[in-house]
């Protein structure tokens, strides 16, 4: 080996070692696979425990789950790691019908069921010996951002809320994504699906995302790009489908209607500046109806930029600091 090659090899080895040491130092927690029940079904999740929890010590805790059809492997581990490194116990889980959790029909999205799963996750967390049940925060993104708005308004066990790029009014949202002349046909299609399921028991499905011009639940280009890439690289068990009934249930969902009831629980909303999936102006209008204490964070980019790169820093650090401010007093 000539001297130049040898020195390049040494430098590359030193750089790799430094990166590995930084990564190891950054992970000041351990993660455990956990299960708990919700309405008789087993939910599967992760429990993050910060290093240094003393015997008998109880830590503030963050409970979190994903948005429309997504599973925990789709970047929730990055957010949970950030919060755990900040000293929080973190519970991450998949809803009934998704991921490794039980429940039928598969890929069926019912907001009331998912909110119930959140409530049961909070209950389970509060029973763990290292959890302070009086210092529980919740985090949600997109469709689960809607869920945490609802929970924050009605579940007083929750002491802090972070809603990232949340859905605030599904009907208003839907009218932005679907042409007005297509709307009556969509309603007729949903009614026909209900009739078919009622008379035959058949469960019909629709892709979560598809190529432009093809029917899907999330008909934006950035939705297609993110779900297909993230599913392939991080969550091979993710299924690109949801029940047709899921859309009908979503259209009746208006979590922003009660946003004023979240107070006095602290609320942070993280809104993307160029969000075409859960439109920016709808989220900001809802935030305006929330009462103090509250904080608005504007994220550069679109809906899915919150999960990676600089967008992850812009979304996760304010969330961590908000939880610290209100749960680590």
Write out the residue ranges for each language-model feature.
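Catalytic histidine neighborhood in serine/cysteine hydrolases
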Residues: 290-304, 318
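Alpha/beta-hydrolase-fold enzymes
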Residues: 149-229
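The serine-hydrolase catalytic nucleophile loop
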Residues: 69-81, 95, 281
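Catalytic nucleophile-loop/oxyanion-hole region of alpha/beta-hydrolase
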Residues: 72-75, 98-137, 309-315
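N-terminal cap/lid segment of alpha/beta-hydrolase-fold proteins
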Residues: 26-57, 110
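Short beta-strand/loop motif that positions the catalytic acidic residue
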Residues: 262-263, 269-271
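Conserved alpha/beta-hydrolase "acid-adjacent" motif
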Residues: 276-282
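Conserved alpha/beta-hydrolase
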Residues: 82-102
